[in-house]
Swiss-Prot record:
Name of the gene: cds1
Family of the protein in this entry: Belongs to the protein kinase superfamily. CAMK Ser/Thr protein kinase family. CHEK2 subfamily.
InterPro entries, sorted: FHA_dom, Kinase-like_dom_sf, Prot_kinase_dom, Protein_kinase_ATP_BS, Ser/Thr_kinase_AS, SMAD_FHA_dom_sf
Post-translational modification: Autophosphorylated.
PROSITE patterns (alphabetical): FHA_DOMAIN, PROTEIN_KINASE_ATP, PROTEIN_KINASE_DOM, PROTEIN_KINASE_ST
Name of the protein in its database record: Serine/threonine-protein kinase cds1
Region Disordered: start-end pairs: 438-460
Annotated source species: Schizosaccharomyces pombe (strain 972 / ATCC 24843)
Amino acid sequence: MEEPEEATQATQEAPLHVSQNIAKQVVNNENVFMKLVMTRMLDGKTEVIPLTTDVHNGFWRFGRHKSCEVVLNGPRVSNFHFEIYQGHRNDSDESENVVFLHDHSSNGTFLNFERLAKNSRTILSNGDEIRIGLGVPKDEISFLCQVPVKHSRDSQKNMIKSENSHYEIIRTLGSGTFAVVKLAVEVNSGKWYAIKIINKRKILLTSSEKRATEMFQREIDILKSLHHPGVVQCHEIFENDDELFIVMEYVEGGDLMDFLIANGSIDEQDCKPLLKQLLETLLHLHKQGVTHRDIKPENILITNDFHLKISDFGLAKVIHGTGTFLETFCGTMGYLAPEVLKSKNVNLDGGYDDKVDIWSLGCVLYVMLTASIPFASSSQAKCIELISKGAYPIEPLLENEISEEGIDLINRMLEINPEKRISESEALQHPWFYTVSTHEHRTPPSSSEHEATEQLNSSS
């Protein structure tokens, strides 16, 4: 398909425009063959685009040209970038219907992080991610594909049902020792959720049934009681004989660790509102009597408009049986406070308070500013020694030109004596928040930042 002659520079128009005539046709249309959830837009807003066979014979064109069914504006968008349509898998009219993605772009269309060959087509499936401008975060536009249940093969196999809702599983988001997290869509509302599925039998093998039940109930009560914009919200909780399901809001931007690995350190001035958000969330949690105990970049999720939400309140992680605390928490040891490591009898009522979260958040701040881990060693014993002494390297902070106020705040958050460690409310009043960084944002990352990103990759 030839692209019309038109200027290729970026425009100042809205990033997304769907023809009003088309928009009216697709509302409540039973002929929708796919929904695209725009999980990353230039304006930070999430849009849902239902694709129907009633529009343009079922061929949906995406691009910058005004004749496209979906008009996208951005420096990486071609006039006709790609099209999506429904068709037969092969030339036979009796073959099954599938959904095709056909690339026509100059700058590239990416499917699940792989660039498609120009003018090639591929079959789309539930949970596929289409991207434009991959590798340039400020220009990136992305879509998440949802095939309606009636078009999905083995749909019943991929369904989870509670008393009031049906969820279609799209793909796996992550997994741990006792739990797996799935991306799912609630069939009736079309809303996206992250469902944590906890294997109760695995937990019961490592702990008494009474202890496990008490821990479950305690954590469930915490999840139900937390209502704050800085906390991932719980939608519903239900269970069967083998599994417990926690349905949480889906935060589309991924976690902070993935962001840092992809983009390197965050400019000091840009870190200030992010840390402020996290401190305010911790202040709320601690006032509610909740200590998170596992603050780390992987448990901090990012919305499209870069609001941070704390997740994972340890339902799968706090359960441990005969294994030692360090064996259970070895993956997150680099963020643990000294008093936690020194505690000989670690349990939910251990001898430490909510200052442990301040220490962990100090580590997170260090990681954001430097893209490196403050307490890292190939030896577990050496890592414990470094944490116990509060001995983190100052060089990455100096190389990133972090201000004296920024270094002072980190020092006060990483104070090994919890009684002397700064509190959330004190940290929010620290001079760092009220000084302006004198150096500009550094782009592209330097070679030292590249090495730091490699360290993050190896530690995550």
